[in-house]
């Protein structure tokens, strides 16, 4: 039951964010901007967190992994990202990407050398455990 509540709550938050972007862009009604299969997980003892990640112009994060599921939504600027076997891609405001458990996030950086960038990471992870592990 908790698993459903967490997933429904996370999905509702993402839909509200989609509504906000649509309203700001002058669009009407909800639209699907992202869909991705997720692994079959038992999520007892897990929690959902919203983490804002801000990048100064040209700034990047070191390669890392998340033991849980991370859904990233670009709030400002452009984010250059490479997750798992997917090709490196630039995401713009309103676009999303997902990191499934323990996938290598090899590239995470601001695509601009002159403008800031920001994303919201909705992270589903085990309570009391680190959300991120830096790649050695």
For each feature predicted by the language model, list its residue ranges.
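Boundary at the C-terminal end of the N-terminal hydrophobic targeting segment
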Residues: 17, 22-27
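A short glycine-rich, His/Asp/Glu-containing loop-to-beta-strand
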Residues: 28-62, 126
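Histidine-centered metal-chelating micro-motifs
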Residues: 60-62, 80, 97, 101-110
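Ligand-binding loop in jelly-roll beta-barrel domains
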Residues: 87-88, 103-129
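Short, conserved beta-strand element in jelly-roll/cupin
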Residues: 69-80
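N-terminal secretory signal peptides and thylakoid transit peptides that target proteins
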Residues: 1-18
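Short acidic-glycine-tyrosine-enriched beta hairpin
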Residues: 85-102
């Amino acid at each position: 039951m908790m698993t459903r509540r967490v997933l429904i709550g996370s999905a509702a938050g993402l839909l509200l964010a989609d509504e906000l972007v649509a309203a700001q862009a002058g669009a009407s009604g909800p639209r699907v901007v992202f869909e991705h299969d997720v692994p079959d997980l038992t999520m007892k003892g897990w929690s959902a967190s919203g983490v804002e990640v801000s990048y100064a112009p040209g700034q990047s994060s070191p390669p890392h992994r998340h033991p849980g599921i991370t859904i990233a939504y670009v709030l400002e600027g452009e984010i250059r990202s490479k997750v798992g076997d997917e090709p490196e891609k630039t995401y713009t405001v309103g676009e999303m990407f997902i990191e499934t458990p323990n996938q290598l996030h090899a590239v995470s950086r601001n695509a601009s050398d002159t403008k800031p960038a920001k994303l919201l990471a909705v992270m589903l992870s085990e309570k009391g455990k680190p959300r991120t592990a830096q790649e050695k």
